[in-house]
């Protein structure tokens, strides 16, 4: 099959690369190309395969976390480091079709469509790592432990499915852990991010009072997608939110603590909950002059947290039950995420550029491996 990869032109012969393209991601040149991948062998008689399945990736998408991995791989290739590989695959969300099953697999069948189950932090099987299932969804073929995928319903299309797992599992966990009351006022920061979008849509489905904070202009269609949430725009790089009339909230969801934590804390009510699942500057090249990452307000922040009995919660992905719940609540008429663009394998640069360089992007960019 044809698969998209970051390619090392110093190590991979030109004849092995089709549709070579270059794009810039925050100052790093990333070279993408299409390579041939053969179906891996899978011996169902081998006991080592008993609890595993072989999956053909039908479509995949990238998350913010993949950006740093892509940039790091490209930097290694560009600097000709000895540890650089000929190709580097990427992508952590996918939908795939099971093509082979091991003898010990009972709940999954050949032909089933599945998505990754990134359960964390609790182990479900000895020797099977928790957390993100793969960083190489673009490889096209994946051999995975049976616990690391879940089947999806027919009414979830491939494009939503390829964008679903990490955002849905993370948002489901964050909402569960905040013990939200029906009267709580909720703020979601960086609201165009994929995780924030999942959070907003899930909260609205339950009837909560949601305010979404953004630094971008939204179209009417985009505002309609999150209605009746109140969308408030602030200037990008604003050092303090004191000059805007935000008010107070009982719960604040924030995907980027290094950008927003210091400004969030003063806007929490007594016994308020702040929860975060990540940070923006996962690589030094991601840092911008307008980022407010001051540490000299830390003492004031902790004083406010102590005086007001605040809860500061860190969240990493979620449990299997969190993902099962998100799948069970999925409504094709009210999807939790928009699909911004769908491209095929021969549009690798467009896929990466749209995913990471377009501030106007609203939702996920999906690459399909289906004809």
Regions found by a protein language model. Give the residues of each.
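Glycine-rich beta-strand-centered segment in the early N-terminal region that forms part
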Residues: 43-61, 74-123
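Short amphipathic alpha-helix with an adjacent loop that forms part of the alpha/beta core around
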Residues: 237-247
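Mid-domain Rossmann-like dinucleotide-binding core that forms the NAD(H)/NADP(H) cofactor-binding site
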Residues: 162-238
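Glycine-rich phosphate-binding loop and adjacent beta-alpha segment
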Residues: 206-208, 259-336, 368-371
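N-terminal Rossmann-like NAD(P) cofactor-binding module of classical short-chain dehydrogenase/reductase
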Residues: 115, 252-253
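NAD(P)H dinucleotide-binding glycine-rich loop of Rossmann-like/cofactor-binding domains
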Residues: 84, 92, 117-190
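C-terminal hydrophobic helical "lid"/dimerization subdomain
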Residues: 173, 319-371
């Amino acid at each position: 099959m044809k698969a998209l990869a970051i390619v090392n032109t110093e190590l991979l012969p030109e004849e092995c690369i089709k549709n070579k393209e270059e794009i810039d991601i925050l100052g790093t040149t990333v070279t993408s190309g299409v390579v041939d991948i053969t179906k891996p062998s899978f011996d169902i008689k081998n006991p080592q395969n008993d609890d595993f399945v072989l999956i053909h990736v039908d479509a995949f998408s990238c998350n913010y976390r993949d950006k740093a991995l892509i940039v790091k791989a490209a930097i290694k290739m560009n600097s000709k480091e000895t540890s650089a590989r000929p190709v580097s695959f990427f992508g952590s969300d996918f939908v795939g079709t099971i093509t082979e099953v091991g003898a010990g697999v009972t709940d999954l069948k050949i032909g089933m469509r599945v998505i990754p189950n990134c359960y964390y932090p609790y182990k479900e099987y000895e020797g099977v790592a928790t957390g993100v299932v793969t960083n190489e969804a673009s490889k096209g073929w994946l051999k995975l432990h049976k616990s690391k995928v879940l089947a999806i319903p027919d009414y979830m299309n491939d494009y939503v499915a390829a964008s679903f797992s990490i955002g849905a599992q993370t948002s489901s966990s964050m909402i569960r852990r905040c013990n939200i009351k029906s009267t709580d006022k909720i703020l979601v920061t960086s609201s165009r991010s994929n995780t924030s979008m999942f959070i907003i849509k899930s909260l609205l489905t339950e009837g909560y009072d949601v305010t979404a904070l953004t630094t971008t202009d939204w179209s009417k269609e985009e505002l309609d997608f999150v209605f009746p949430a109140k969308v408030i725009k602030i200037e990008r790089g604003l050092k303090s939110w004191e000059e805007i009339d935000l008010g107070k909230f009982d719960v604040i969801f924030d995907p980027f603590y290094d950008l927003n934590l210091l400004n969030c804390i003063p806007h929490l009510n007594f016994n308020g909950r702040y929860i975060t699942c990540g940070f923006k500057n996962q690589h030094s090249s991601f840092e911008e002059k307008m980022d407010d990452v001051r540490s000299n307000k830390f003492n004031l922040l902790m004083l406010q947290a102590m005086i007001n009995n605040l809860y500061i919660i860190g969240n990493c992905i979620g449990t299997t039950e969190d993902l099962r719940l998100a799948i069970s609540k999925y409504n094709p008429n009210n999807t939790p995420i928009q699909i911004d663009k769908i491209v095929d394998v021969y549009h690798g640069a467009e896929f990466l550029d749209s995913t990471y360089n377009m501030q106007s992007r609203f939702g996920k960019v999906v690459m399909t491996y289906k004809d």
